[in-house]
Amino acid sequence: MNSTKTEPAGVSDDTEARCQIVRTLDIVGEKWSLLIVRDALRGSTRFSEFRDSLGAPSDILTTRLAKLVDAGVLEKRAYREPGSRERSSYHLTESGRGLSLVMGALVQWGDTYNPYSGGKSSKLVDTEGHEEVSLAFIHPSGRALTTEEVTLVPGPASRIRW
């Protein structure tokens, strides 16, 4: 997939096309899409695994998987179990693995601002020591910043001034 996409599908307004958030939501903003990515990050690769975990209708799941493949988030691979027909499995690409930061931010936000009374259903841990980690904005000096110390400003491609 071209990483410098200028006209995302479904976005006709040039101002919207310039916005990274609009372009990203065009790919993963529909119901089920981020949940498919979540399950793929947890190791799911087969249609039946996604269907059973999510409870998504098969036609919608098929559409979302195809869209994520077309967008370069997932890669479709053929496999065949002995005595069965050929099927497809779905694997995260580099782009898809990059969404782990988004998923981590959603987990962290949910734990902080919308916690479940029964405790955490997911935790962010490092792969070696399995110690819990958190996401942060890091200043070039290496210092972690609070959300009050970070703001969103127009970039060079923006046509608006805030």
Where are these regions (language model features)?
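C-terminal regulatory/oligomerization modules of transcriptional regulators
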Residues: 2-5, 104-162
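Short, hydrophobic-biased segments on the C-terminal half of alpha helices
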Residues: 65-66
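Glycine-centered, phosphate/nucleic-acid-interacting loop/turn motifs that mediate DNA/RNA or nucleotide
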Residues: 72-73
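Short beta-strand "wing" residues that participate in macromolecule-binding interfaces
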Residues: 76
